[in-house]
């Protein structure tokens, strides 16, 4: 059985930064270090950080006044930010800079009194944070749509003063269809200068298309609550390739590969390489060949840590 390995795969720059922020905070400060929501959507990563002292909570009221809290990579609403300031919390913001870019876009549309349309998945923390960045005091409204049917039912205040943004981890193909529907219904709608779907999401979706074109089965390493990982599985399935989303190698079933000559492996942007290697090892234990890594776009994006976490340890407290 041939094994193909997608490239790029796994951690993106935003995830690297978010995990590094928690790690640095754990090194520099006395516990407890609170993290609002899973810092990234991966069970292995969250469990590892929790074992080293991070305390994960869902809401800010679970964090005692005056404590250290880290906001997850998905971002938070302005109300959460304001509450943290009111309660004298020391905040390290692990929001991905590409999510922050969308927050800035939304805030500008609100400031201009426009309506905004957010393309995204209801209930996802990134969507909740972005919706919460829209200030209604200037007369505008923000609307959430997930698909073309939502666009068909959408009613806005002024179709001539309307803009859209998107969640960063969506399917590129699905989003393109929703944007087309918006432009058809609202010809004057404004959009971002550069696509809001992040570079890592785009690159991993392109890579899984390549993978699915070669393989009978595709394994996506990622947690069930990871938006970008789910989109990878769905994309492989749309290319008529059987696909499974797995947290780790223990979730694999040997029967999936009965009579299979080729299998592909990729990973969502919040899945660490160690989990990918465990999957590859299990496939080889079941008779797979040495993995062949496919060519792909080389990623060299990096994001800086907050200034307070870049100060050399020898200067902390001076």
Curated annotation (Swiss-Prot):
Pathway: Isoprenoid biosynthesis; dimethylallyl diphosphate biosynthesis; dimethylallyl diphosphate from (2E)-4-hydroxy-3-methylbutenyl diphosphate: step 1/1; Isoprenoid biosynthesis; isopentenyl diphosphate biosynthesis via DXP pathway; isopentenyl diphosphate from 1-deoxy-D-xylulose 5-phosphate: step 6/6. Belongs to the IspH family. (2E)-4-hydroxy-3-methylbut-2-enyl diphosphate binds at residues 41, 74, 124, 168, 226-228, 270. InterPro entries: LytB/IspH (IPR003451). Dimethylallyl diphosphate binds at residues 41, 74, 124, 226-228, 270. The active site is at 126 (proton donor). This is 4-hydroxy-3-methylbut-2-enyl diphosphate reductase. Its EC number is 1.17.7.4. Isopentenyl diphosphate binds at residues 41, 74, 124, 226-228, 270. It catalyses: isopentenyl diphosphate + 2 oxidized [2Fe-2S]-[ferredoxin] + H2O = (2E)-4-hydroxy-3-methylbut-2-enyl diphosphate + 2 reduced [2Fe-2S]-[ferredoxin] + 2 H(+); dimethylallyl diphosphate + 2 oxidized [2Fe-2S]-[ferredoxin] + H2O = (2E)-4-hydroxy-3-methylbut-2-enyl diphosphate + 2 reduced [2Fe-2S]-[ferredoxin] + 2 H(+). One of its GO terms (molecular function) is 4-hydroxy-3-methylbut-2-enyl diphosphate reductase activity.
